[in-house]
A protein has these predicted regions:
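Acidic, Ser/Thr-rich low-complexity segments on the non-lumenal side of membrane proteins
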Residues: 108-138
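A generic short-segment signal for beta-strand/edge and adjacent turn/coil regions
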Residues: 96-99, 114, 138-143
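Coil-to-alpha-helix initiation sites in intrinsically disordered, low-complexity, charged segments
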Residues: 2, 97-98, 115-116, 157, ...
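Hydrophobic transmembrane alpha-helical segments that form the core helix bundle
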Residues: 1-110, 119-122, 178-185
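A membrane-cytosol interface segment of integral membrane proteins
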Residues: 130, 135-187
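Internal amphipathic alpha-helical segments of the cytochrome P450 catalytic fold
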Residues: 73-74, 127, 142
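Juxtamembrane/interface motifs at transmembrane-helix termini
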Residues: 84-87, 112-113, 163-167
Length: 187
């Protein structure tokens, strides 16, 4: 329970470079299955080597400005985008009875409204629900598909508006009784 809630804590999302990338995508997968995730070692060593090289040649400030800060910002944004597209007001989660693949894509993953610049920077990640319906659709075709298939416009939505971000970050667990996501206080 503690681990589940800590994974959904805003600080875990903010420090996504360490929590999501290094620990969640590099270290933990390797520890769980070394043969399957052998590529974690080169990734970890590459990051470490680049960090040491930057400190030697450019000092600590060089490390912070060229590696840590950009990775910190990108990982925090990426971690939040993933979180918000699965934990948002109006999300619907169903047990096996009543669950369908398409229903889960449209009701349990969101359409994240973004401006054209953010859509470009994130490779149209806002169309996440379409990705869950068919992951083979290239990112550059997602807006076209969204426009041309009316059913895809019925997905639950969220945005990067500060109030919407706060609403998403407050949601932690699915309440079976009320059939909605709630914060820790709602337990």
């Amino acid at each position: 329970r503690f681990l589940y809630l800590s994974m959904r804590h805003p600080l875990t999302i903010l420090f996504g470079y360490v929590t999501v990338f290094l620990f969640g995508m590099v270290i933990l997968p390797f520890l769980n299955s070394p043969r399957k995730n052998f590529d974690s070692i080169p990734a970890f060593l590459l990051h470490g080597t680049i960090a040491v090289w930057l400190v030697i040649y450019f000092g600590w400030l060089g490390l912070v400005l060229t590696l840590l800060l950009p990775f910190f910002i990108a990982s925090a944004i990426g971690s939040y985008l993933f979180y918000a597209q699965h934990n948002f007001p109006g999300v619907i989660l169903k047990a096996k009875k009543g669950w369908t693949y398409e229903g889960a894509a449209l009701e349990s993953s969101s359409y994240l409204k973004t401006n054209p610049v953010m859509a470009w920077f994130t490779a149209n990640i806002g169309y996440h629900h379409i990705h869950h319906i068919n992951h083979l659709v290239p990112f550059y075709r997602l807006p076209e598909l969204y426009r041309d298939v009316p059913e895809l416009r019925q997905a639950r939505t969220t945005s990067l508006h500060p109030l919407e971000v706060l609403r998403c970050l407050r949601l932690k667990v699915w309440c079976v009784e009320t059939q909605r996501m709630v914060g820790v206080q709602g337990l």
